[in-house]
Amino acid sequence: MKNHKFYIVTLCYNCEEYINDCLESIVTQQYDNYKVIIIDDASSDGTVKRIKDFLNKHNHFNDRFNLIENSERKGPLANHIQSLEVEEIKDNDIILHLDGDDLLTCSTSLSIINKNYANNPNHLISYGDYESATGKESICKPWQSNISVSEYIAPIGWIFSHIRTFKYMLWKHIDKKLSFYDEEGKIFTSAGDVAIMKPLLELAGRKRTMFFNKKMYYYRDNTSLNEHNDHLHDQ
């Protein structure tokens, strides 16, 4: 079975209370073909110190981590784009988004995702499912029609949430100017997850999209860091 390389993108802003749990959930995975790209978006608390302390304590993992410290805030979408420009990523490598205040809920998360991609080589993207910190029901549901993403979600709302992964080859084909910038040429400063996933899903189509109904992601929707609660309405 093919063992895909994962690039885990972890974006942080003032999440010192949660970042250790996030990183611990990565290094305890039973799958070891991965690299972690951490971008701290100019946190004003002790997030960066917590990250460096963790990496010093687990220094045998240091070659798998790349910590980038922004000197000024750029916003989630700009950070997502930046994260995929700092490594030499190959077409079939898998990108996984794990926010700094969230965590993977089981040590086999990467193994399960890899197995599904290996068994379904034509699939290019996956999403769902998660456990909510507030106990709210997950919004993730299977995509059950061949109509476009925009048409499908119009009556039911957004359903493509954590746990989100995609093959890098899909990312290369996005029209980034059209997808990520407004009419004035300014990058969207909010709802980065939606801005990224929507064009990827449109490119892949339903038949090359996987839905996981196993909850492999713990989503802290009760923090001030939660992008969906704070900013999604701005998109």
Positions of PLM-derived features:
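Nucleotide-sugar donor-binding/catalytic module of glycosyltransferases
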Residues: 2-235
